[in-house]
């Protein structure tokens, strides 16, 4: 089983080797039996979608306030990753994410944040930090499509903590291997803007794919629980 480490070495090298990316395979479920015109019963197959994996909301939302770029609103999905969502809300409400950077930006793939070491003036330390504890994996069949939010890990089972990534371009090679816990419902254009910033692709001043010279800062993450100021509800 392949994992995205907290600090990915290189763009997609050693992570999603092109020859190893699997095509998206839809899940097929038996929807039920229908009576045909001739009176015979025929089985009808229904493709299971991402929407079938979650219950109807409202869900809690996390709003990432990105300095100079705007807000990213994430719908959290506790029914597919309850412990991951609970941990993310806890860290956000404690102010853990305030001042943390998006330290990895790979256009067409993902943007990654959540490392407290990204506040350190020495960028060589960036990529391996966390909250000081680890949480269990909560893998599901929810696909890693554009805007999906998933938990990063250290390359081992049950090694996530605080680092997360937002999918920029559909990445089926990650499906079932990382804990999806949310999806962007507003501000995907901010995600797009982050992928357009200048990055240190050669690692001259720290890890590769780190925004440089202008960092992408999360000023705050605010949690809006169900029925509390969530747009559209």
Give the predicted meaning of each segment:
Residues 8, 29-32, 227:
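N-terminal regions of proteins, emphasizing targeting and processing segments when present
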Residues 2-3, 34-233:
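Cyclophilin-like peptidyl-prolyl cis-trans isomerases
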Residues 20-34:
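Bacterial N-terminal signal peptides
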């Amino acid at each position: 089983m392949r994992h995205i480490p907290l600090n990915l070495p290189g763009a997609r090298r050693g992570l999603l080797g092109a020859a190893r990316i699997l095509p998206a395979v839809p899940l097929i479920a038996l929807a039920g039996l229908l009576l045909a015109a001739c009176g015979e019963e025929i089985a009808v197959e229904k493709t299971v979608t991402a929407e079938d994996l979650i219950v109807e909301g409202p869900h809690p939302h996390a709003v990432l306030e990105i300095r100079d770029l705007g807000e990213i609103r994430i719908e959290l999905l506790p029914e597919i990753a309850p412990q991951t969502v609970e941990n993310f809300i806890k860290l956000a409400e404690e102010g853990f994410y305030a001042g943390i950077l998006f330290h990895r930006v790979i256009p067409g793939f993902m943007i990654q944040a959540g490392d407290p070491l990204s506040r350190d003036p020495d960028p060589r330390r960036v990529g391996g930090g966390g909250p000081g504890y680890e949480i269990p994996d909560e893998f599901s069949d929810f696909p890693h499509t554009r805007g999906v939010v998933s938990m990063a890990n250290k390359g081992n089972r049950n090694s996530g903590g605080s680092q997360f990534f937002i999918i920029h371009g559909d990445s089926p090679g990650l499906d079932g291997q990382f804990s999806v816990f949310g999806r962007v419902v507003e501000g995907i254009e901010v995600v797009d803007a982050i992928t357009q910033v200048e990055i240190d692709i050669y690692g001259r001043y720290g890890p590769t794919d780190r925004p440089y010279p202008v960092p992408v800062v999360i000023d705050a993450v605010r949690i809006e629980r169900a029925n509390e100021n969530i747009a559209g509800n």
